[in-house]
Design a protein with these regions (language model features):
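P-loop (Walker A) phosphate-binding loop of NTP-binding proteins
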Residues: 8
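ATP-binding Walker
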Residues: 11
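Walker A/P-loop
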Residues: 14
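Conserved substrate/cofactor phosphate-moiety recognition/catalytic segment
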Residues: 18, 22-62
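NTP-dependent small-molecule kinase module
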Residues: 19, 23, 74, 99, ...
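Glycine-rich phosphate-binding loop used to anchor ATP phosphates in small-molecule kinases
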Residues: 55-99, 103
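A glycine- and Lys/Arg-enriched "phosphate-lid" helix/loop adjacent to the NTP-binding pocket
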Residues: 97-147
Length: 184
C-alpha cells in the first residue's frame, strides 16, 4: 500500500509521514528530497532551469512514478508537495492506486512551524517581525485557498494535523478498511 500525504507547506507532511511510516513499518519518502537526489540539484535551481511550474511537475512526476511503481518497498508513505494532486502527479497517483490524505491545520499553527530555505535547500533561521508574520499568514491562507480544491480531491480530504497525532490517521484508515488488521 502506498499512502501519500498532501497539504500546504509546513502543515506537517514530512513529520507526520515519518511517524506514520515508522508506526506501520513502512518506508518513508519525501518527494521533494527524492526529486533533489534524482536530479542532483535543489528544487529551486531545477525550477529555474524549466520554463513553467507545469513543466517542473511534469519532470518531477517521473520521480513519483518511480516511487509508486518500485517493488523493493511495496508499503510506503510519501510526503507530497502542495501541488501533489495536480496534473502529472494526479495521473501517477491514480495509476498507482495510492491512498491520498490531505492534512490541514490552522494558518497560525502552520506559521509557527514555517521553515525557510536558501537556493540550495539549506535551512535558514529567520526571526519574523510582526509585519512579516502578518504577510506569511496571508500567504499561507492564500495557499490553502488555491490548493484547497485539489486537496479536497484526495481519497480522505480532511484529516487535521493534531499536534503530530499520526495515530489519528491510522484510526481513520482502519475505520475506512484501508489498513488491514495486520497493521499495528
Amino acid at each position: 500500500m502506498k499512502i501519500c500525504l498532501v497539504g500546504v507547506s509546513c502543515v506537517g507532511k514530512t513529520t507526520m509521514g515519518k511517524r506514520l511510516a515508522e508506526r506501520l513499518g513502512y518506508a518513508f519518502f519525501d518527494l521533494d528530497a527524492e526529486i533533489e537526489d534524482t536530479f542532483g540539484t535543489s528544487i529551486e535551481r531545477l525550477k529555474s532551469e524549466l520554463l513553467t511550474e507545469y513543466s517542473f511537475r511534469q519532470k518531477a512526476a517521473l520521480v513519483l512514478k518511480r516511487l509508486v511503481r518500485q517493488q523493493e518497498k511495496p508499503h510506503c508513505v510519501v510526503a507530497l508537495p502542495p501541488s501533489g494532486l495536480m496534473d502529472h502527479y494526479a495521473r501517477v497517483l491514480k495509476q498507482g492506486a495510492c491512498v491520498t490524505i490531505a492534512l490541514y491545520d490552522r494558518p497560525e499553527n502552520i506559521l509557527a512551524r514555517i521553515t525557510f530555505y536558501d537556493k540550495d535547500s539549506h535551512p535558514i533561521h529567520k526571526a519574523l517581525s510582526a509585519a512579516e508574520k502578518a504577510y506569511y499568514l496571508r500567504e499561507i491562507t492564500a495557499d490553502m485557498t488555491y490548493f484547497g480544491p485539489w486537496h479536497r480531491k484526495s481519497s480522505y480530504p480532511k484529516i487535521r494535523h493534531v499536534c503530530g497525532d499520526f495515530a489519528q490517521i491510522i484510526r481513520f484508515l482502519r475505520r475506512h478498511d484501508v489498513l488491514w488488521p495486520m497493521a499495528p
